């Protein structure tokens, strides 16, 4: 699947510190690397394309864009993979409700997502993979789990073909056989897991499962649903196995960082890690990093609630995407926070001040190759669990002095924060 154009990231001289991230599985901050050889891999779960990109989505993708920029500044070789869940129940339900073909709806929303990401100057993935592009590979992985005894069938009376059965992942068997055990990634207790499973696409009450928390690997074909012929019969993939297979196909093992919103900690990231470990006998990732939830009008912003602030609508209203980006960067990526008009207005004013600060950079006498104290301090803030609010505060304080920026400082704001000063975005 095609991604979106990559913005130019300036190179800035100097010796950036080793970046760190909060690892959900460890409950602490740790280096955002695995091997120390300068090669890093990032997998971030992508959209289910049934509605437009809202500020909550943008906040998550910007968090991991910032991680990439910090890695690149450090000189690392970065491989970034993102999926698109372009066949799933919410997409099919929206397509049915609106009377459009699910494939057309997915294509339309993916294109809008690309446009929003390009406008926000989010670095694109090196591999942008739709689930429909890897159905055969997912089915082969499910077949392998069946062969190993970590997958099993469950009676499916409503299957389109008599005798066809859904396939589930046996969490107890996987935990006994490999490096992963249920709860390793999330740290949640079983009661919390059961509640979240029911809330987030699981089916803990389904009869015939060995454990209520066992997740779906393969959904047998139902009437009027898309299905593919495969090694495990006609049907379509379950949610968690899709990401495990795509990551294992596209990235070195273990993945350096598995990223996404905090609402993916369980069941999605927990189970993806379990599937990958069952297939490889190895831990899936070194760091599990999660962004906080964004609220609007007092509730978590979500498609199901409809309380959305859409990036495309802000852009259509004339808001500079750089101001949107600064509004998001002003929040720590792990924090839960609420979007307000006042927050956006503050960022519009900040952008104007920064643009003015940068306007005379070309006329300064400072050596463009020497980053200086400000750039090093910004690097230190970003290396400390992506402390973008701290980095912004440092820049605000410098701007307030009235001393013009140096060319290297302007380049560093672009390279590290993705804000091209003096260059209004479309």
UniProtKB/Swiss-Prot annotation:
Description of how the protein assembles with itself and partners: Monomer.
Pfam families xrefs: tRNA-synt_1e
GO biological process, one term: mycothiol biosynthetic process
Listed cofactors: Zn(2+)
Positions occupied by motif 'KMSKS' region: 300-304
HAMAP family tied to this protein: MshC (MF_01697)
One annotated Gene Ontology cellular component of this protein: cytosol
NCBIfam families associated with the record: mycothiol_MshC
EC numbers for this chain: 6.3.1.13
Function: Catalyzes the ATP-dependent condensation of GlcN-Ins and L-cysteine to form L-Cys-GlcN-Ins.
Record motif 'HIGH' region, residues: 47-57
Swiss-Prot/TrEMBL catalytic activity: 1D-myo-inositol 2-amino-2-deoxy-alpha-D-glucopyranoside + L-cysteine + ATP = 1D-myo-inositol 2-(L-cysteinylamino)-2-deoxy-alpha-D-glucopyranoside + AMP + diphosphate + H(+)
GO MF annotation list: ATP binding; cysteine-glucosaminylinositol ligase activity; cysteine-tRNA ligase activity; zinc ion binding
Main enzyme class: ligase
Cofactor binding note of this UniProt entry: Binds 1 zinc ion per subunit.
Species per Swiss-Prot/TrEMBL record: Clavibacter michiganensis subsp. michiganensis (strain NCPPB 382)
PANTHER family in the cross-refs: CYSTEINE--TRNA LIGASE, CYTOPLASMIC (PTHR10890:SF3), CYSTEINYL-TRNA SYNTHETASE (PTHR10890)
Residues spanning the membrane: none
The protein, known as: L-cysteine:1D-myo-inositol 2-amino-2-deoxy-alpha-D-glucopyranoside ligase
Record carries keyword Ligase: yes
Keywords: ATP-binding, Ligase, Metal-binding, Nucleotide-binding, Zinc
Motif segment ('ERGGDP' region): 199-204
């Amino acid at each position: 699947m095609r991604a979106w154009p990559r913005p130019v990231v300036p190179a800035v001289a100097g010796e950036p510190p080793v970046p760190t991230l909060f690892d959900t599985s460890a409950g602490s901050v740790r280096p955002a690397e695995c091997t120390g050889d300068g090669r890093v891999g990032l997998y971030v779960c992508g959209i289910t394309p049934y509605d437009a990109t809202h500020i909550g989505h943008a906040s998550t993708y910007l968090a991991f864009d910032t991680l990439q920029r910090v890695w690149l500044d450090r000189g690392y070789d970065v491989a970034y993979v993102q999926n698109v869940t372009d066949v799933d129940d919410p997409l099919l339900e929206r397509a049915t409700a609106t009377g459009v073909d699910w494939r057309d709806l997915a294509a339309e929303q993916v294109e809008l997502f690309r446009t929003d990401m390009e406008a926000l100057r989010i670095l694109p993935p090196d591999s942008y993979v739709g689930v429909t592009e890897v159905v055969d590979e997912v089915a082969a992985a499910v077949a392998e789990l069946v062969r190993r005894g970590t997958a099993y069938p469950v009676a499916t009376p409503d299957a389109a073909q008599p005798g066809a059965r859904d396939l589930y992942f046996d969490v107890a068997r996987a935990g006994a056989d490999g490096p992963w055990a249920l709860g390793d990634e999330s740290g949640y207790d079983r009661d919390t897991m059961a509640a979240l499973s029911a809330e987030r696409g699981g089916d803990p009450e389904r009869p015939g499962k060995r454990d209520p928390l066992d997740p779906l690997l393969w959904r047998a074909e139902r009437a009027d649903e898309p299905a593919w012929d495969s090694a495990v019969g006609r049907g379509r993939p379950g949610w968690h196995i899709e990401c495990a297979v795509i990551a294992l196909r596209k990235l070195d093992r273990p993945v350096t960082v598995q990223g996404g919103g905090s609402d993916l900690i369980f069941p999605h990231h927990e189970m993806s890690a379990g599937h990958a470990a069952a297939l490889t006998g190895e831990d899936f990732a070194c760091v599990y990093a999660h962004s906080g939830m964004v609220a609007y009008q007092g509730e978590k912003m979500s498609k199901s609630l409809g309380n959305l602030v859409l990036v495309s609508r802000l852009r259509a209203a004339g808001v500079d995407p750089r101001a949107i980006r600064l509004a998001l960067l002003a929040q720590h990526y792990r924090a839960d926070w609420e979007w307000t008009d006042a927050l956006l207005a503050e960022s519009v004013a900040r952008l104007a001040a920064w643009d003015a600060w940068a306007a005379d950079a070309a006329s300064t006498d400072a050596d463009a190759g020497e980053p200086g104290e400000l750039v090093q301090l910004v690097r230190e803030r970003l290396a400390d669990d992506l402390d973008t609010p701290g980095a912004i505060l440092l820049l605000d304080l410098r701007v307030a002095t009235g001393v013009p920026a140096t060319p290297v400082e302007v380049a560093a704001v672009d390279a590290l924060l993705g804000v091209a000063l003096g260059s209004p975005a479309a």
